[in-house]
From Swiss-Prot:
The lineage of its organism: Bacteria, Pseudomonadati, Pseudomonadota, Gammaproteobacteria, Enterobacterales. The gene is tam. It comes from Yersinia enterocolitica serotype O:8 / biotype 1B (strain NCTC 13174 / 8081). It is an enzyme of class 2 (transferase). Keywords: Cytoplasm, Methyltransferase, S-adenosyl-L-methionine, Transferase. This is Trans-aconitate 2-methyltransferase. GO terms for molecular function: trans-aconitate 2-methyltransferase activity. InterPro entries: Methyltransf_25 (IPR041698), SAM-dependent_MTases_sf (IPR029063), Trans-aconitate_MeTrfase (IPR023506), Trans_acon_MeTrfase_C (IPR023149). Its EC number is 2.1.1.144.
């Protein structure tokens, strides 16, 4: 895919950062020396980590050069690395591996999660938050539009770019044999959005990318118009005119054996 657009992503930064704050709040009281922020994006999550652990060796990792440039501008004193999480291997075991809204883009979690857990120091923590919204109207509509337009052939693979996350039971069984403790929970956020168009704009920065990028500009506009029509019906106005965007997310905080 093309590089990410940090400016578009930051349009809803407060809403995107809230789960990162919630994940950080569930990390047990500790003083980690080495922290990696996997899929750091424009640095909003890295900034939270830096504020809580100002003395730690903190590194943000992302495969988007544009996102890393934005993160470096935000946090000039932090270290950022352009790398693929699947090939990432830290020089030293990590005390905290933090991944906010990034691992859902990677496949084969059966291999990925044990691998990441193996990069922890004794008593280290793996903290993960992943959107779990592929069955929500917002994402069902993407697949529906893709299957019913002149772009059908072009977008045959778009819906499989991001796989459905595993169940809580599966993640528990992957981590528990190597963990002192595994904490898993699921939260649905209800974001009041000013309009159906705002919901589309939110998703243009993330979930819609695999559907839009293969299309020519004219087809892209037509796709977005068809998508907006479905979103407008799927998320009716509330009493104040806003639309409630339900956004389920899965959280995992696991501590390695001592």
């Amino acid at each position: 895919m093309q590089d990410w657009d940090p400016d578009l992503y930051r349009q809803f930064e407060a809403e995107r950062t809230r789960p990162a704050r919630d994940l950080l709040a569930h990390i047990p009281a500790t003083i980690p020396q080495r922290i990696s922020d996997l899929g750091c994006g424009p640095g909003n999550s890295t900034q939270l980590l830096h504020q809580r652990f100002p003395d730690a060796q903190l590194m943000g990792i992302d495969n988007s050069r544009a996102m890393l440039l934005s993160a470096q501008q935000r946090l000039p004193d932090c270290v950022f690395l352009e790398a693929d999480i699947r090939q990432w291997q830290p020089a030293e075991p990590q005390d905290l591996i933090y991944a906010n809204a990034s691992l859902q883009w990677l496949t084969d979690h059966q291999q990925l999660f044990p691998y990441l857990f193996s990069q922890l120091a004794a008593n280290g923590i793996l903290a993960v938050q992943m959107p779990d919204n592929l069955d929500e109207p917002s994402h069902r509509a993407m697949r529906e539009v893709a299957e019913n337009g002149p772009w059908q052939q072009t977008l045959q693979e778009a819906g499989v770019v991001r796989a459905k996350v595993l169940t809580a039971n599966q993640y528990y069984d992957l981590l528990a044999p190597h963990a002192e403790q595994v904490d898993i929970w699921r939260t649905t956020y209800y974001h009041p959005m000013p309009s159906a168009q705002a919901i589309v704009d939110w998703l243009r920065a993330t979930g819609l990318r695999p559907f839009l990028e293969p299309l020519a500009e004219s087809m892209r506009l037509d796709f977005l118009q068809d998508y907006l029509t479905i979103i407008d019906a799927a998320y009716p106005q509330q009493v104040d005119g806003r639309r409630l965007l339900a956004f389920p997310r899965l959280f995992i905080v696991a501590r390695a054996l001592k």
